[in-house]
């Protein structure tokens, strides 16, 4: 076969593969953060992310330009603000989501209500679940998202940088929390009373800052708790995650319960940083300021 004929045959074969779809990106099979195996016929070109934290992680993994839909609150990085909003995590525009024709839906497993998950499953679209218990889980999650999107090299660079940033944070206690460690209640909202459990990055941040979350025995990111249970657990510190005017109202309400150690010791402090509640890579940068706020706090501190 002469060179010209060989070139013609090669071009013809390549054209056949392209037209038949066999030249598409290879299939993807991956285990997500929840341990579920996800299989896609090709690397996803269109991703819907139903969590602000998951959206931030996708950008870190190099897949931000694939995200065609997300939820209210997905404001980081800056480019995420340009993505179409599909409502919030518990009030989604399902018809619009389906119209976007995503190759995969990325959710934050522990922050997605079971009814929402059931509704998503009815769409018969692949669902990838993100799940972080602490900061140390974050680099691994980014690497997995890189494998999902086919952006492994970008994800690896980002994961290594994040490992360095996490290493610079105060360390978690290696053993059981010391008796002198102040016990803290984080008041995320008042009606209903939302706090954080062991599956929230704020729980990890509190530990790294030298305190202990009084609800760290709840294996859930953001549980609703009863006021009587808070009084029973009697925190040394109450950390309020609300704007100044709202936290002032909360402080006034707490003043009616002087039997609570934190109230008697006047260890009620306000700390608002959306990065920690969003739970993406920027949450790492919020930890030093939290530690600074908690530094003066101590267990059973006397009234000042």
Regions inferred by a protein language model and the residue ranges of each:
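Short helices/loops that flank or line small-molecule/ion binding pockets
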Residues: 94-101, 123, 225-234
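Extracytoplasmic substrate-binding proteins
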Residues: 27-30, 36-37, 103-104, 108, ...
């Amino acid at each position: 076969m002469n060179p010209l004929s060989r070139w013609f045959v090669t071009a013809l074969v390549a054209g056949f593969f392209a037209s038949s779809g066999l030249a598409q990106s290879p299939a993807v099979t991956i285990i997500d953060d929840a341990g579920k195996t996800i299989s896609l016929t090709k690397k996803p070109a269109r991703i819907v992310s139903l969590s602000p934290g998951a959206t931030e992680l996708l950008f870190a993994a190099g897949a931000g330009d694939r995200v065609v839909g997300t939820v209210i609150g997905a404001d980081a990085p800056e480019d995420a603000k340009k993505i179409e909003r599909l409502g919030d995590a518990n009030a989604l525009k399902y018809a619009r989501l389906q119209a976007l024709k995503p190759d995969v839906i990325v959710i934050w497993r522990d922050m997605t209500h079971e009814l929402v998950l059931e509704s998503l499953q009815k769409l018969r679209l692949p669902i990838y679940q993100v799940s972080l218990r602490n900061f140390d889980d974050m680099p691994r999650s980014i690497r997995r998202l890189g494998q999902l999107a086919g952006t492994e090299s970008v994800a690896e660079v980002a994961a290594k940088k994040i490992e360095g940033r996490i290493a610079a944070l105060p360390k978690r206690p290696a053993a059981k929390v010391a008796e002198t460690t102040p016990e803290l209640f984080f008041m995320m909202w008042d009606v209903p009373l939302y706090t954080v459990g062991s599956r929230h990055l704020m729980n990890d941040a509190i530990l790294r800052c030298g305190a202990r979350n009084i609800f760290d025995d709840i294996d859930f990111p953001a549980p609703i708790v009863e006021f009587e249970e808070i009084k029973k657990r009697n925190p040394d510190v109450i950390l309020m995650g609300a704007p100044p005017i709202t936290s002032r109202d909360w402080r006034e309400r707490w003043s009616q319960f002087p039997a609570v150690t934190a109230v008697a010791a006047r260890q009620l402090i306000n700390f608002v940083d959306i990065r920690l509640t969003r739970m993406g890579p920027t949450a790492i940068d919020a930890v030093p300021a939290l530690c600074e706020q908690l530094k003066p706090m101590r267990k059973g501190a006397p009234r000042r």
